[in-house]
């Protein structure tokens, strides 16, 4: 399957997967910008994970971070996320204990 011309979508709130290869991109006013037929070869999450690049033959579709949540949850194992959250909460707890002084005055 051939892809259309490379399309850059800047202001997208969500994408609806109508079938295996058809994606409809909507902007914030809920009107479809364009229906693009793509053949997903590789999903590459870049740097700070603020956008996603779908490689479709030689064409690239850039989509904003809001759509990443669905894909990230399927890529990253949930136990890894749970471990990361519990580690972060433990650091917060230790920091809050360190702030309390013996005479009930906070040292932070």
Swiss-Prot record:
Record carries keyword Transmembrane: yes
Membrane topology category: Single-pass membrane protein
Domain of life: Bacteria
Main location: membrane
Transmembrane feature ranges: 59-81
Subcellular location(s) of the protein: Membrane
Keywords, alphabetical: Membrane, Transmembrane, Transmembrane helix
GO cellular component: membrane
Name listed for the protein in its UniProt record: Uncharacterized protein RC0045
Species in which this protein is naturally found: Rickettsia conorii (strain ATCC VR-613 / Malish 7)
């Amino acid at each position: 399957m051939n892809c259309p011309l490379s399309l850059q979508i800047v202001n997208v709130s969500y994408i609806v997967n109508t079938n295996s290869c058809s994606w409809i991109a909507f902007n914030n006013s809920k009107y479809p910008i364009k229906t693009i037929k793509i053949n997903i070869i590789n999903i590459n999450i870049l740097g700070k994970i603020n956008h996603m690049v779908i490689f479709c033959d030689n064409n690239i579709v850039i989509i904003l971070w809001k759509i990443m949540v669905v894909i990230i949850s399927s890529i990253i194992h949930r136990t890894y996320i749970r471990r990361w959250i519990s580690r972060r909460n433990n650091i917060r707890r230790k920091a809050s204990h360190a702030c309390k002084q013996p005479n009930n005055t906070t040292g932070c």
